[in-house]
Amino acid sequence: MLNNKIDFSKYDPKLWFAIEQEKKRQENHIELIASENYTSNYVMDVQGSQLTNKYAEGYPGKRYYGGCEYVDIIEELAIERAKKLFNADYANVQPHSGSQANFSVYTALLNPGDTILGMKLSHGGHLTHGSSVNFSGKMYNVISYGVDENGEINYEELLRLTKKYKPKMIIGGFSAYSGICNWKKMRFIADNADAYFVVDMAHVAGLVAAGIYPNPINYAHVVTSTTHKTLAGPRGGLILAKNGDDILYKKLNLSVFPGAQGGPLMHVIAAKAIAFKEALEPKFKTYQKQIVKNSKVMVERFLEKGYKIISGHTFNHLFLIDLTNKKITGKDADIILSKANITVNKNTIPNDLKSPFITSGIRIGTAAVTRRGFKENEVSRISDWITSILNNVDDHNNVLQIKKKVLEMCLKYPVYI
């Protein structure tokens, strides 16, 4: 196991070195990538258990291999906890990732060439919502909706496109949107075309579990998610549904296995079970509330410093900074901030004129820093450090001075040590 329990530094020094350096990086960097988080020691320990040895094709009670009596218990625990956490009556915990979950749902409900309607990647959507470089953009006829001039989902455009193109599926959810989605309105629009409404809540699953972001389960035909990000579990996928029928649930199960995957990763499913248990505890809700508080404080601080925030606010764990008026690209901001041990990611903004490899913005998320104990005071200071660096990109001494402050803060709030 890699959490300092077995020393294999002499057996494989190159691998040991890389892992040790990554552990140090996580301890000594302020992590503001919105899709990243720190999982618990319980989750990491379970993922390094003997469960990694077990093949278990099929579902509990219906396996293709023998010796599955204990992994059946584990998967059933994960399923029941997921259903309880999100108020669902169906859960599939086998998808290896969020993208795999989406692929499985699409292939269960659609035929190749069907029309889908998803959020533009450049406006905050995800690759799997219809990007031309992704399977979703290759297998299906894609129509895209976006945000309006205020950075909010354009529901009028969504309704107009739905009436015009009659999609088989409308996809809700995002990877870079700081607002609250009106799931009820989106389901109403989907019903106008007799379309499936599928929600990818990967980014806000933790907030949904804590009851501080609207739960799509009562409006979507199917909900997908990752189990990391704000949920703070292992890297993996999840499919949920409510008020469906056995025909739908059977389609979904068959689409995951044998449709998209073979054997499930039982060590990861066990880690999901532990993460769901953690998310059912009262302190998880406190953590999620603090994530949003920290996000709002950072937005307010950036606005005070003259920075433009897409939509001008945040109601979740993330927000986008438009750097156009700062004469710096997202790529360059990413690079210069990393020199001070502050990790962000470059991100396109709505109607961006720059390529996704350059971008005019950066995305900031507060799930990871909140996990290590940062509160309003700390994230306010971090916002000041970021603006100081971006306002003086050629002042290398300033970067070094801020890096020292970053290291001091990280030492005060360790992740694992």
Curated annotation (Swiss-Prot):
Cellular-component GO terms for this entry: cytosol
Cofactor: pyridoxal 5'-phosphate
Domain of life assignment: Bacteria
Alphabetized Pfam families for the sequence: SHMT
Record has Repressor as a keyword: no
Keyword vocabulary terms for this entry: Amino-acid biosynthesis, Cytoplasm, One-carbon metabolism, Pyridoxal phosphate, Transferase
Subcellular location, principal: cytoplasm
Site feature Plays an important role in substrate specificity, where: 228
Residues annotated to bind (6S)-5,6,7,8-tetrahydrofolate: 121, 125-127, 355-357
Catalytic activity: (6R)-5,10-methylene-5,6,7,8-tetrahydrofolate + glycine + H2O = (6S)-5,6,7,8-tetrahydrofolate + L-serine
Annotated metabolic or biological route of this protein: One-carbon metabolism; tetrahydrofolate interconversion; Amino-acid biosynthesis; glycine biosynthesis; glycine from L-serine: step 1/1
Biological processes annotated in GO: glycine biosynthetic process from serine; tetrahydrofolate interconversion
Subunit structure: Homodimer.
Descriptive protein name: Serine hydroxymethyltransferase
Taxonomic placement: Bacteria, Pseudomonadati, Pseudomonadota, Gammaproteobacteria, Enterobacterales
